[in-house]
Amino acid sequence: MTETKVYADDFRCSFGDSDQFIEFLKERKAQSTWMTAPSKSLQFRALAGNENLSNLYMQIYQSNGKAEVLADTMENTSLLLNIKGTDYPVRSCALKTILERARISGNALNKVSREVFTRILNYCLDVASGDSLIKVADDKVSAVHGGDPKDYAVLEMLPLFQMVGSFLDREFPGYQFLTANYDHSIVTAIWQLDGQANDLLDTYHQELANRGLSTDAVVPGLRFTTSDVGMSGANLYPILITAKRGRIIPLGDPIKTEHTNSADLMHFEGQLALLYARFRETIEKQIKLMDVEIRYPYNTMLGVLKRIKAPKKASFEAADQFLSLIHI
């Protein structure tokens, strides 16, 4: 099963228990490290198209009992990164930050062979300035960030989630941990804030009652998402959760903590303190939306998707799904 192969690029898992989730994050922290090296000293090697090199490394990994790690890499990126004389397999989620560090982009990169792609990376890194901050997790390189704290600030996942839990214990007693999802790119957890439902949603419930709608339909919640590989900041999303089906209704923009400008846990703690006020603000906006009449929901949804420049095919699929949800 994929869930047992933490090293695999497509590894993912879910948790319904907060203690198990935290223990899992502790294991991931123990199996990861951050290292700094001059960007121009980094050298990539392609395994694809080089049978002799592939066989040599497979023998090495077999002797270390980690042949599956290399086999998974060959099925995905087929890249090794040499850092200070040691070769590390490269995970798929690292490609985004690698390209950003090398300052290259373009669809053509997906069409060239791995050998050509590797040469391009090495040429670009050879003229790069400054240091790179590299995360190695579960035997593979997961990210290559800029080495200056202004470029990338490390905010470890474990203390972030622990801080959110402590904050909810203190400020939102009576909450429930619903679920958490982990993969090598991004981690998300969701809590249901039952204990504060009346306080946060009193006006909202009153407006629902005035319109003849059930006040038990939704409860407040929090979704927290973070990433160590450049996919997301440490972002707090106030949400509503439908009571019957558990669907999530986003409430405006998240409270974002970007991994830049020397951001630290103290800064994130300050962001947590904004959560109650953000709930109030977004609920007020939600109430105002109740006065907006939508006569043609299908066309309205298509218009919204066009506004955000969603692909046409995906837009029609989303609009059809939306139509089925509202039972028109």
For each of these PLM feature ranges, what is it?
Residues 2-163, 171:
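Feature for intrinsically disordered/low-complexity regulatory segments and propeptides
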